[in-house]
A protein has these predicted regions:
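Amphipathic alpha-helical dimerization/coiled-coil segments
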Residues: 1-30, 48, 53, 101-125
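Histidine-centered divalent metal-coordination motifs
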Residues: 43, 75-76
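N-terminal helix-turn-helix DNA-binding core of bacterial DNA-binding proteins
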Residues: 25-69, 91-103
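A detector of long soluble domains/segments in diverse envelope-associated and cytosolic proteins
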Residues: 79, 93, 121-124
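Recognition helix of helix-turn-helix DNA-binding domains
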Residues: 71-72, 78, 90
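Alpha-helical residues within the helix-turn-helix
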Residues: 63-64, 75, 81-82
Length: 125
């Protein structure tokens, strides 16, 4: 039976399995933090809302769109901030959130590494 399986695999048109790129310890820790932060459905949707904006979005706008209180939004945005996904600026008593472009580029590079896409993109260029 084992020989039959080996022969079958030789006949099939499967591509060789590609190994993903190596993650540094910092990249790995960052990804763990990012995935933990986005692992909550409400936080994921808050992040998506913030990321969809051209300008920073006020916390009051986030509260209005979700069935949560202002302290809950503050908690979720704190987790997203600590994961390096967003940044906050203050204007008087209001907090405004946006995706930090530098963090977004770093995150894209890290997720590209975890998915092994950097090599594929470079090969296509």
């Amino acid at each position: 039976m084992a020989r039959a399986m080996i022969r079958l695999r030789e006949i099939e048109c499967c591509e060789p399995v590609r190994e993903p790129g190596v993650l540094t310890l910092n990249e790995r820790q960052r990804l763990i933090g990012v995935f933990k932060a986005l692992g909550d459905g409400t936080r994921l949707e808050i992040f998506r809302l913030i990321a969809a904006q051209v300008e920073p979005i006020c916390a009051c706008e986030i509260v209005d769109r979700f069935a949560v209180t202002q302290p809950t939004v503050a908690h979720h945005t704190k987790v997203l901030r600590e994961a390096g996904l967003i940044r906050v600026s203050r204007r008087g008593i209001w907090a405004y959130y946006e995706v930090d472009p530098a963090d977004a580029e770093a995150l894209e590079a890290i997720t590209g590494t975890i998915l092994g896409r950097q090599e594929r993109v470079a090969a296509l260029a």
